[in-house]
Design a protein with these regions (language model features):
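Short, low-complexity N-terminal intrinsically disordered segments enriched in polar/charged residues
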Residues: 1-49, 53
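A beta-strand edge to alpha-helix "cap/lid" segment located at domain peripheries
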Residues: 1-23, 82-88, 92-181
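Residue-level detector of alpha-helix boundaries and kinks
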Residues: 20, 32, 59, 63, ...
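A solvent-exposed, acidic/Ser-Thr-rich amphipathic alpha-helical stretch
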Residues: 26-27, 44-116
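Alpha-helical packing segments of well-folded alpha/beta enzyme cores
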Residues: 31, 35, 77, 138-140
Length: 181
């Protein structure tokens, strides 16, 4: 059975959209939903259409802020992310807060990593041809400007909660088709 289902990443947002009538909150939820779906596709142009021209991302961890800055920096980040084939993920949200200015999500991020990619990221990989599961706790603040575009993805992460080699049977077919075709 597949260890992740990327479509579950945006289930909580879809559920909130079903019960939210405030137009601005719907706009904020909808742009983050579109962003998540485009990232999973992966469709770089569609993904970048959700990001403002003056975007400034912050990825907070033990080493400080490592997020890309500016639209070009964000585009380069996502192009590399897609090329790494690490976009196969499931963000298991257990909290979602929306207001007129931002969406805040919290949950466990489950990400599939090709062994070579995991090795480049500094993880202890004993087989670069294998596939690995990386799990971390994340809180993400998604500010949205008055035009309805994402101005940042400010994430705070716990670091690895789990990192392990996977059996082929645990990999979703879409991952196998993209990474091992």
């Amino acid at each position: 059975m597949a260890v992740i289902d990327p479509t579950r990443t945006w289930q909580m947002i879809e559920q909130r959209l079903e019960t939210t009538s405030n137009p601005r909150h719907r706009q904020v939820l909808s742009i983050v939903l579109e962003h998540m779906i485009a990232e999973a596709a992966p469709d770089l142009d569609r993904l970048m259409a959700t990001v403002s021209a003056d975007a400034v991302y912050h990825f907070w961890g033990n080493e400080g802020d490592s997020g890309p800055k500016g639209h070009d920096g964000v585009r380069e980040y996502y192009a590399a992310f897609v090329a790494s084939k690490a976009n196969h993920l499931e963000y298991k949200m257990d909290r979602l807060v929306v207001d007129d200015h931002a969406l805040v999500t919290e949950g466990d991020l489950h990400m599939l990593l090709p062994g070579a990619t995991a090795q480049q990221m500094g993880f202890p990989v004993d087989d670069p041809a294998a596939d690995y599961l990386y799990v971390s706790r994340q809180l993400i603040v998604w500010p949205v400007n008055e035009d309805g575009l994402i101005t940042a993805e400010d994430s705070y992460t716990s670091g690895p909660l789990e990192f392990r080699k996977l059996d082929r049977a645990e990999l979703p077919q879409a991952y196998l088709d993209r990474v091992h075709a």
